[in-house]
């Protein structure tokens, strides 16, 4: 799957890909998150459907391939992003007792004309769920999985 996607210009996070087999074991579905510059695009998934060893269908959202299409501006550092997260949690009344993982990622926004931008985000995994802070504006972002 990964080699095929690379041939068509799509990088994926193979370590987090999910494979689901049919009850007979004759078919399977592979779903993976796309990458841009090594960072996951959290709302950009690609799915490959196989029957036996034959690829039947590729579906999902094709990520941008041009670095100039990513959002411009300087990204905030991790300490600033954590402070924004704490302020958001406090303002929202969420009770969070631990942050279990922090990482960089992107969110892809596509307009009706087909053009799009990649917005850098900080992703915080906590004991109450994942939260995303815009890496440029510091605002909380809502991420919906596209497939």
Regions found by a protein language model. Give the residues of each.
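Long, terminal "pre-/pro-" and other extracytoplasmic accessory regions
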Residues: 1-147
């Amino acid at each position: 799957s990964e080699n095929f996607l690379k041939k068509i210009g799509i990088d994926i996070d193979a370590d987090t890909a999910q494979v689901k087999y049919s009850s007979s074991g004759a078919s399977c579905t592979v779903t993976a998150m796309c990458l841009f510059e090594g960072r996951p695009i959290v709302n950009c998934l690609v799915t490959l459907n196989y029957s036996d060893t034959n690829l039947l269908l590729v579906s999902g959202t094709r990520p941008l391939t041009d670095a100039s299409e990513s959002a411009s501006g300087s990204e905030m550092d991790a300490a600033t992003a954590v402070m924004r997260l704490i302020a958001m949690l406090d303002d929202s009344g969420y009770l969070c007792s631990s942050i279990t993982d922090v990482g960089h990622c992107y969110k892809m926004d596509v307009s009706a004309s087909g053009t799009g931008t990649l917005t850098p985000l900080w992703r915080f995994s906590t004991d109450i769920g994942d939260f995303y802070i815009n890496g440029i504006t510091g605002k909380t972002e809502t991420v919906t999985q596209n497939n």
